[in-house]
A protein has these predicted regions:
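DPxDG-like acidic metal-binding loop motif
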Residues: 1-59, 66
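Buried hydrophobic positions in well-ordered alpha/beta secondary-structure cores of metabolic enzymes
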Residues: 9-10, 90, 129
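Short, hydrophobic/aromatic-rich segments at coil-to-beta transitions
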Residues: 32-36, 87-89, 134
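Residues at the C-termini of beta-strands that transition into short coil/loop
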Residues: 49, 58, 83, 94, ...
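Short clusters of hydrophobic/aromatic residues that line enzyme substrate/ligand-binding pockets
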Residues: 54, 79, 172-174
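Oxyanion/phosphate-interacting regions
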Residues: 66, 70-72, 102-111, 118, ...
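Short loop->beta-strand "edge-of-pocket" segments that line small-molecule binding or catalytic clefts
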Residues: 73-101, 107, 111-120
Length: 179
């Protein structure tokens, strides 16, 4: 089943801050296996498949007529990148920061000496974790399948997972009866 969100980050789009994305995912047996997230303003493309891994391509405006997956992969950076950081990075929603998220961040600050908080919009947050620029993205507010499926596929292909907040160690599932 294909899951498409043609404008993820509607609030960010309206605010004109550039933090909106186009998300496309392929889900098989409830698990996202292919994901594509495009950031039109930044001209960045994140893409992944369980067979090929996760990648980021910067500076993309259009695809050439002879573009192939091999050419895209060759021009891209494999995720996660090996980024050396001296702090624990939490990425949180710019528009959906809840008291539960704030409590989670406070708990992280008790565990780690240096904590940096990055606020971002839309599925960019999942991409930042998959890329290795952030350690965790806590989200306790309700979300829809089209908000997470593409990013989830990218995270999985980068060796990470997205779990249900109320059921620790249970990955998100897709194509459920109740959205």
């Amino acid at each position: 089943m294909w899951i498409v969100d043609p404008l993820d980050g509607t609030k960010e789009f309206i605010k004109r801050n550039g933090e909106f994305t186009v998300n496309i995912a392929l889900v098989k047996a409830g698990v996202p296996i292919i994901g594509v997230i495009y950031l039109p303003v930044k001209k960045e493309l994140y893409f992944a498949g369980q067979e090929i891994g996760a990648y980021k391509l910067s500076g993309i405006t259009t695809l050439e007529d002879d573009a192939t997956l091999d050419k895209l992969v060759a021009a891209s950076v494999r995720l996660p990148q090996d980024l050396q950081r001296d702090r624990f990075v939490v990425v949180a929603s710019r528009s959906h920061l809840t008291p539960e998220t704030e409590a989670y961040i406070d708990a992280v600050k008790q565990k780690h000496k240096h904590v940096e908080l990055i606020s971002s919009g839309s599925s960019i947050k999942i991409c930042l974790v998959a890329e290795g620029k952030a350690d965790v993205y806590p989200r306790f507010a309700p979300t829809m399948e089209w908000d997470t499926a593409a990013g989830h596929a990218i995270a999985r292909a980068a060796g990470m997972e997205i779990y249900q907040a109320d059921k620790k160690d249970v990955p998100l599932q897709y194509n459920k009866e109740d959205l």
